[in-house]
């Protein structure tokens, strides 16, 4: 949602949470051969998904951090960084600059945090099934306080976006609208199969990437932004597959509430195959585009980075619900590395 709120929907992106012992006990006999993998996956989920606790045991700062869900900020911050690098005007000294600090503040705790809060607010019924430890369904943050926090964070996001560039402030406003379209009834795009994943992926990648480039480009036109638009759009294809992997953790709740994700619509294994194809095609097409730009070495590196992901996808397809956390924890590193390689290629092409 919000510009980088896109992150919002993205809420689920890199790391996923919780599968209960109930679901593990329901595994059929033909899945017992994967018992050790299931146990490992469960342990990982327990580590990253705190149990439901009463508010008296948590400080207000801890509650706020859980509500903002910091783990979801990373992909959006990374997209902003890739956009900055691709501008050709971003160098090592800029890491210490005020503009970069504001960019990280915006794409991380502010815009992405706003998205997370919006998503939690509108998904509170679903979270009672899938993620009961989240602050709202857990009773740790009231709806009134959540509304106040969302309003304050939205205003701060627009303000910081404007300080970076007026156009970025507009992106933030559009992102806030997108967040509502994604999560709120009656539209609730996340219920509409492909629509939810696509809008999240676009917001997740294209908008922050272009915002990063705009932030550091002294002058820009649609033509100058075109290489970044193409690469970011192609990685959006891959990100759509990533969104599908994040859906495996909430299949039961989605099915009960009527959220039509790919795993719900096509089955978990078929959805895993679709996700793998999208992830690979997007990156290979990006490598092909770099070849068109004459950046052959960068294209080769991007293509090689797909190989370990392809290998890990065999385990994912075999057991999507137990291997999703492991896949994201390992394979995503190669995908985001490919994004940075593409950004460096665009910078090289411009220079």
Report each predicted region and the residues it spans:
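Multi-pass alpha-helical membrane architecture of UbiA-family
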Residues: 3-27, 31-351
């Amino acid at each position: 949602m919000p510009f980088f709120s896109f992150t919002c929907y993205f809420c689920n992106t890199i790391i996923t949470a919780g599968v209960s012992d109930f679901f593990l006990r329901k595994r059929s006999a033909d899945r017992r051969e994967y018992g050790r993998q299931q146990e490992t996956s469960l342990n990982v989920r327990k580590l990253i998904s705190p149990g439901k606790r009463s508010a008296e045991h948590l400080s207000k700062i801890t509650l706020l951090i859980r509500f903002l869900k910091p783990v979801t900020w990373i992909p959006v911050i990374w997209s902003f960084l890739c956009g900055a690098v691709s501008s050709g005007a971003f160098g090592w000294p800029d890491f210490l600059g005020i503009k970069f600090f504001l960019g990280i503040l915006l794409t991380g705790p502010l815009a992405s945090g706003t998205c997370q809060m919006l998503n939690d607010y509108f998904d509170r019924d679903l979270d009672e099934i899938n993620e009961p430890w989240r602050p709202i369904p857990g009773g740790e943050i009231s709806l009134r306080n959540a509304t106040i926090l969302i309003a304050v964070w939205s205003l701060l996001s627009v303000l910081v976006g404007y300080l970076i560039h007026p156009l970025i402030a507009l992106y933030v406003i559009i992102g806030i609208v997108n967040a509502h379209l994604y999560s709120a009834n009656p539209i609730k795009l996340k219920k509409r199969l492909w629509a939810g994943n696509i809008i999240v992926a676009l917001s997740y990648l294209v908008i922050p990437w272009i915002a990063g480039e705009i932030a550091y480009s002294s002058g820009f036109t649609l033509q100058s932004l075109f290489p970044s638009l193409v690469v970011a759009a192609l990685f959006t294809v891959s990100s759509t597959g990533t969104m599908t992997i994040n859906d495996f953790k909430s299949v039961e709740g989605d099915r009960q509430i009527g959220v039509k994700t790919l795993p719900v619509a096509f089955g978990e294994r078929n959805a895993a195959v679709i996700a793998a194809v999208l992830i690979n095609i997007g990156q290979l097409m990006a490598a092909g585009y770099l070849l068109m730009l004459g950046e052959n070495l960068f294209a080769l590196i991007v293509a090689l980075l797909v190989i370990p992901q392809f290998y890990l996808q065999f385990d994912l397809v075999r057991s999507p619900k137990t291997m999703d956390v492991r896949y994201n924890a390992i394979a995503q590193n190669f995908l985001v590395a490919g994004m940075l390689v593409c950004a460096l290629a665009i910078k090289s092409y411009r220079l």
